[in-house]
């Protein structure tokens, strides 16, 4: 009982540490909101954009309100992620696949914003980068199986992702012993003479080196071959959803690598050249190397490496498997010389007599029985590709500031290539350290000319103001404003402002059709629960950031409060309380299970509904209810639209028994008990050995042996002997000759 109280206090303290989170989605996502915009309308817009001829119709607009702010997304089909020769391969055919459901864009009028995702069946899924951080949008049924929900999608902020970054010995990456085995294996590759690039011969010395740098200046794109196994397809369900997940991962790492300066090598990008999708129909296909359900992470990487990937910069396999020790990914580490592996590596013979391509890696989206949030998977992908690019794990005080005793450095966190997974919310978590940059720069200088290709530059005429452009109103038959030169103009003029014009409406909502900045009093953004309306400042076309409303302003229909401009805090915090969960085990009425409940800090015994007499001085008897779809009754059910807690037991008793037996927490508790009571384990071990020795000693003298030199076995004392009843004496009969008996028997 004491242990139970301590556990409750610890859980309450953990809730207090993240007190602003009041609507958890699962054990990794502490707060979310539902989205219920019109999917039919968005689907129709997508169909129009897909076959659009006019410039205006090529854009897909999506407006919704969530987390105390307004999202006005303006997106266009993303063609930068797929090469001109892009193919999708299935078990029986190769397709020229339509990727028109993949979009990229921004929040209209918000400088520095960015969005990427897909539109499938009228629903947007992807991520949205804003000034206040990144939001992730996913289908609701991926987390909540109740189909009567009043919303179809969920949206959550990156700060609400609570990923336990100490899982596994290396927190998502294989341990040192695995990498050491891989390193030794990489050293055994047999180099073919024809594979040595001509420019590596130093016959012409510095002159050749200068020429190499010049010719490779635009070769900055790594082309990918990505396969997905049948388990990955089974989780996401459709071919479109699988391709959307791949594009989301590639876009995420593309953003990280493009913004990193690798010692003068800039704008490193990624492009998908080919995708192989193994569907559930390939689960028993003997030609599918990934068909077996129980494959270790090293073997899984080896199966990928046994294929020939000479046509690609890197080749990855995405899966939905729960690998041992919490491993989320594994990849071969590249090197500038001396060993095989990493980017641009060609298939060659190794010490085990097999030809392999070591420009490979693998990624899984499952960890300890649960699916990780997209952000965690994106960072894992960036980490493993970092290995391919030549970076080992960060080490030393310079490159592991998160381990520093200096609080200022520690606050910034560790970098991408840190040995253990990072929480993702620190300044350095999405950056490469100086150690990684030095290592990657050496590999890029040596190898990128072997397989990298030229990337597409910003496109004048796509309606988006990109780097090097002043404005972008489209081509001559599309451009409707008088402020910007269209894309049909000669170089030096196209996508530039016309003389004497201050701005173009393509730059943002604070520019008039007369090419002048709007006055300071004009509104460019509606106010939201937690932010005031946006007002033009009179000297830029972009809509300035809105001022946040005071902290603890009610938002989200008075169920939450504003914190620093975000609708993220619980209404309980407004009165110095903490949010708690009303559970039936505490004697709460069934009607209270879907109420917002509050308690005094660190005192779970005071947990009560906002409509209770206990908190009437704060809420005046007003009952605040949870949103439909919110977890209730201590995560044993979900609130329906009638504010009733519907219990969910989708797994059944057998699945619960399996989870109880194979739960990692069970074995962690056993391991902790063994460490704490090692002496008891030692005594039990000695007792077991003595018991076995005594058993063998006692029973060995009664055990018969075929060895004639050993004494005969002793009879067991007190053994009961069975008495046979007397048999009648029979007269002996004359036996037939053996030969006739055998022949007669054979004839029968």
From Swiss-Prot:
SMART domains assigned: DISIN
Gene Ontology terms, MF aspect: endopeptidase activity; integrin binding; metal ion binding; metallodipeptidase activity; metalloendopeptidase activity; metalloendopeptidase activity involved in amyloid precursor protein catabolic process; metallopeptidase activity; protein homodimerization activity
Chief location bin: membrane
Enzyme Commission number, as recorded: 3.4.24.81
Domain Disintegrin: 457-551
Induction of expression: In osteoarthritis affected-cartilage.
GO cellular component: adherens junction; axon; cell surface; clathrin-coated vesicle; cytoplasm; dendrite; endoplasmic reticulum lumen; extracellular exosome
Catalytic activity: Endopeptidase of broad specificity
Textual note on the cofactor: Binds 1 zinc ion per subunit.
Regulation: Catalytically inactive when the propeptide is intact and associated with the mature enzyme. The disintegrin and cysteine-rich regions modulate access of substrates to exerts an inhibitory effect on the cleavage of ADAM10 substrates.
Protein name from the UniProt record: Disintegrin and metalloproteinase domain-containing protein 10
